[in-house]
């Protein structure tokens, strides 16, 4: 048979090797505490900044979910917060006592500012964290900048810190504390538990580090050091 060029590409249907999923970067509890302390000591918008950070670490929300929260979700000293996630799916996330306290304190100041704005003819904002920008609420980019400022003030490497690393820290610390994957999946709003399972690998790596650092038999003997 005479050889000719094929009209189609026979390899187009062949799938290439999949990329290995990178483990999410996270923070330890000491680093999270430093970030929270830095927010509490903010020179401007201290109550708002404290509320943002406490809610983020207490719930593991995505940054867009956090900054766009409606103020109605925060009324009545809630023990659970209704969050609207990807695809408009709603979920309830529990609030820790520090997060509830930070939220209550912030609402007092926020409502006072809103009352003053209304007296000047401005409409009330439906958002928990209002802004004069086009969206009407604090942008994710502004919060990204804020969290970097908290990192610098708290002595944590800014390269390690993003709103998403706080979400990772929330999940990893819960898992280390004994929470089950299904509960963490629900709180994070993951559609598939396989997405949540990656945190078990993060925890495995952290446990290995702790063993190598603290276990007496993991340290080199005197003869090995010589």
Located regions from the model:
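Conserved catalytic core of the tyrosine transesterase superfamily
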Residues: 1-226
């Amino acid at each position: 048979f005479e050889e000719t060029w094929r009209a189609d590409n026979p390899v187009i249907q062949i799938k290439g090797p999949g990329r290995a999923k990178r483990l999410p970067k996270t923070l330890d509890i000491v680093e999270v505490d430093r970030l929270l302390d830095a927010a509490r000591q903010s020179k401007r918008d201290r109550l708002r900044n404290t509320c943002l950070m406490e809610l983020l670490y207490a719930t593991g929300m995505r940054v867009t979910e956090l900054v766009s929260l409606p103020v109605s979700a925060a009324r009545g000293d809630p023990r659970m917060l209704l969050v609207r996630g990807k695809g408009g799916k709603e979920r309830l996330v529990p609030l820790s006592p520090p997060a509830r306290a930070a939220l209550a304190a912030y609402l007092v100041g926020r409502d006072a500012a809103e009352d003053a704005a209304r007296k000047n003819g401005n409409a009330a904002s439906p958002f928990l964290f209002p802004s004069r920008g086009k969206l009407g609420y604090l942008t994710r980019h502004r919060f990204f900048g804020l969290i970097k400022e908290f990192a610098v003030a708290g002595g944590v490497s800014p390269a390690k810190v993003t709103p998403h690393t706080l979400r990772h820290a929330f999940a990893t610390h819960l898992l280390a504390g004994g929470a089950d994957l299904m509960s963490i999946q629900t709180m994070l709003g993951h559609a598939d538990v396989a997405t949540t399972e990656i945190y078990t690998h993060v925890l495995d790596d952290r446990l290995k580090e702790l063993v190598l650092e603290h276990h007496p038999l993991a340290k080199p003997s005197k003869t090995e050091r010589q």
